[in-house]
Amino acid sequence: MAIKLLNDNVINKIAAGEVIERPASVVKELLENAIDAASRNIAVKISGAGLDSIEVTDDGEGISMEELPLAFLRHATSKIENEGDLLRIMSMGFRGEALPSIASVSRIDIYSKKEKQEGIHCFIEGGKILDLQYFPGPEGSKIIVSDLFFNTPARKKFLRSPVTEGNNAYELVIKYALARPDIAISFSNEKRQLFRTPGNGSLNDAVIAIFGRDFLEPLIPVKWEGLSLSISGLISPPGVAKMNRKRQLIFVNQRPIRSPLLYRALDEGYRGLLLAREQPLVILQIAVPPDSIDVNVHPQKSEIRFRDEQSIFRSLCGLLRDTLNARDYRLQDNLPQNRSQPFYPAAGRKTAKQKVEEQPVIPFMHNRKADKRVEETGGEPWIPFYPEEQAEGSVSRVYDEFKILGQLWDSYILLEKEQTLNIVDQHAAHERIIYSRLQQFYAASRGEMQMLAFPLLMDLSLRDMELLEKNQEILGELGFDLQQAGPRSIFLRGTPAIIAGQEREVLFEILELLAGGQGINLKNEAIIKMACKKAVKAGTRLDYREMMQIIQELFITDDYKNCPHGRPTIIAWKQADLERMFKR
């Protein structure tokens, strides 16, 4: 086949494949253009997850009648003029690819007006300008993108669900709203505004506008300035963490970025203060000279390279350690030490205490008769889930004789049974036990609710309020009693008994599940969240009786070999396996 020069329409569609992957990509490019136009107010609205329409309105500089046709030509831009400008980029965009790429796969209406000039309207379909005329309007621009991917239907097959695509756009606008707290940025989905930042330059006020005051309250302000580097923002104390990096928002020269280097710095700064897989919450602004970074790495400009990576790494690590060392945050501080909360969820029975004498560190033989010596007390909550008469019959299914050899690294229970060495992950095992019991509870009836003596007042985001309103029934089934207190606040009056002391944290976790549109698995995912939060954590020292209780309950639990997330609870080596390793 002969080599041919592709026409502009095909070239633009190829470029669109790199730049415009999904509706959120369109939102990103239009939002960056609005920021570069020196806008003070930007409104983003989407409909149909962004496939039906995406509208971005700003009060920026606008586009003139003469410039507008150029705006839809590839590599036409007002951001740079020569090669040297690439070394000191401060604008969000600079490639001149966004508008032609968007136009090639959608229908676009543009309304724009520059100061002291007439307003204009332009209609573009599939990359072709079909109408261009003067049109009265306010200064600034309004761009409406409709029928995204109408001429590339195969692209739609690779998109996620409407809920997921809508959330992608929502999360993206959040990043820019926090990167630029000096600009009032709002986001609306299906004509309902989910947030609007005040644009007064205060990061705290922007966080409150987006997430609510309860999100901001535990965060710690940080600030550090060097000769050619400054870092400022908010970080979470070790006791406040998530299981992913979703709320690690990092901006370099006010540009949202992803950086493995900075993620490693966060991991190092929090090393020894978080449990395995936990991630801190951070909102950080890093300012460096524009010629010390390279943003021309990826078409989406989401990755950058630092000229002096070691300096950035050391500075961020040092700031985190100095801030967190101001108080003696130890890992043990973040683990549940209050034994006034049950080790297992108890169903309507008195608290019981098993009298077990102090056990030696060296192996000891399990003796169920000794464990059955019980006395009534009023304070020790580490009780079996089952009532005692039920537990006795169930435990007969457990190993008749085994040795608990001890605890390894305050995280694993070592167990010997029938010439087999078993290593039990205490968190995964306890999580499986609690999950199975909660499933039984919720299968039999509505969740066991504990009414709070003093209702908790929670300040939430508008999106969270919308999610609560739409999911009242399933939250009630889980055991939550909520009452609206204001446009953005609720009274939490009752919660599932199992999450006592962790009400706020668990509700926020469930709100994330609701936002993700888990559908028919939502209830099960919420139960997993509650079990995970309640389960004893890695790094928690257990006494003999507590280890014994986990082992007894684990082996009478269905599917005991894996936790609800699918990770193994127990790993076993037979004596023959060990002898083979030692070449005996």
UniProtKB/Swiss-Prot annotation:
SUPFAM superfamilies xref list: ATPase domain of HSP90 chaperone/DNA topoisomerase II/histidine kinase, DNA mismatch repair protein MutL, Ribosomal protein S5 domain 2-like
Residue pairs linked by disulfide bridges in the UniProt entry: none
GO biological process, one term: mismatch repair
Record-linked SMART domains: DNA_mis_repair, MutL_C
Record key words, sorted: DNA damage, DNA repair
InterPro entries per UniProt: DNA_mismatch_repair_CS, DNA_mismatch_repair_MutL, DNA_mismatch_S5_2-like, HATPase_C_sf, MutL/Mlh/PMS, MutL/Mlh/Pms-like, MutL_C, MutL_C_dimsub
Signal peptide (from-to): none
Cellular-component GO terms for this entry: mismatch repair complex
One Gene Ontology molecular-function label: ATP-dependent DNA damage sensor activity
Function (record text): This protein is involved in the repair of mismatches in DNA. It is required for dam-dependent methyl-directed DNA mismatch repair. May act as a 'molecular matchmaker', a protein that promotes the formation of a stable complex between two or more DNA-binding proteins in an ATP-dependent manner without itself being part of a final effector complex.
Family to which this protein belongs: Belongs to the DNA mismatch repair MutL/HexB family.
Protein name as annotated: DNA mismatch repair protein MutL
The species this protein was found in: Syntrophomonas wolfei subsp. wolfei (strain DSM 2245B / Goettingen)
Gene: mutL
